[in-house]
Amino acid sequence: MATTSNQNVEFVRTGYGKNMVKVLHIRREGNHHHIIELIANVQLTLKTRKDYLTGDNSDIIPTDTVKNTVHALAKLKGIKSIESFALDICEHFLTAFNHVTRVKVNIDEVPWKRLEKNGVEHNHAFIHCPEALRFCEAEQYLSKTPVVHSGLKDMKVLKTTQTGFEGFLRDRFTTLTDAKDRFFCTSVYARWRYNTINVAFDAAWKAVKDTVIQKFAGPYDRGEYSPSVQKTLYDTQLLVLDRIPEVEEIEIIMPNQHYFVIDMTKIGLSNKDEVYLPLDNPSGNITGTVCRKPRARM
């Protein structure tokens, strides 16, 4: 059997790190407490590859050290937002070690929400409220400006009217009929890239989330008609770019999760669009990514 010589191959990329590093940070302002709980994945790339080539581990920062560093930085720096903390991690490894050339940090935030009653916030009690999961990614190369993405996922929204789907292409396999009025249910995934790191990250994330909900639902008293998932997705992206100048590019994925009227004629009932069958699959999957044209950038 022929063997491949190392003279005939080259590295495309290398990296290692620690995944699923969990931490919860409490910031106390007297009796009023603030918390952020997160799960971080940290990956490092080193200047040399002697660990791969010869088994020389002398440059390797142990992944246990990576975990300890995340915990230590939470203590030393605090956590203002998951994005700012990801940047702190990147900066630490690139400045503390002269042989680290790249750091990539992915963070998911655990969705704790402060308890509130009649407009009064609780000082120190929270409820797990996963209406939309927040995540981010920061990547930085040695002597380069970091690139930051933020995102939301698993935000499930539904409306029972003000949406349709008509005028689509038909061929001999098409059985779908035009729908002037239908359900629209989706689990939104959105990921956007900033053109600067000088961002009020919490406010920007909330603005994107609120914009997605606004374009999906429309005005509360009458809604807003959607002729397709594609149109709603694109209109949402345009409004995000208009409202948040720090966002350079945004990807949105909206799977079309179907609900069908249940045929009850066989049991002697007339179902006039009142009882539906939710179908998890198959589902449509609509995606789009837009960015600012060069002349439109800040």
UniProtKB/Swiss-Prot annotation:
Pathway given in the UniProt record: Purine metabolism; urate degradation; (S)-allantoin from urate: step 1/3
Compartments reported by the entry: Peroxisome
Entry EC number(s): 1.7.3.3
Regulation of its function: Competitively inhibited by xanthine.
Catalytic-site annotation from UniProt: K18 (charge relay system), T63 (charge relay system), H258 (charge relay system)
Cellular component per GO, a single term: peroxisome
GO biological process per UniProt: protein homotetramerization; purine nucleobase catabolic process; urate catabolic process; urate metabolic process
Catalytic function, reaction form: urate + O2 + H2O = 5-hydroxyisourate + H2O2
Short motif Microbody targeting signal, span: 296-298
Main location: other
Keywords: Oxidoreductase, Peroxisome, Purine metabolism
Keyword Aminoacyl-tRNA synthetase on entry: no
Database matches in Pfam families: Uricase
Chain positions recorded as urate binding sites: T63, D64, F165, R182, V229, Q230, N256
Family named by the database record: Belongs to the uricase family.
NCBIfam families per record: urate_oxi
Subunit details: Homotetramer; dimer of dimers.
Functional note: Catalyzes the oxidation of uric acid to 5-hydroxyisourate, which is further processed to form (S)-allantoin.
Name of the protein: Uricase
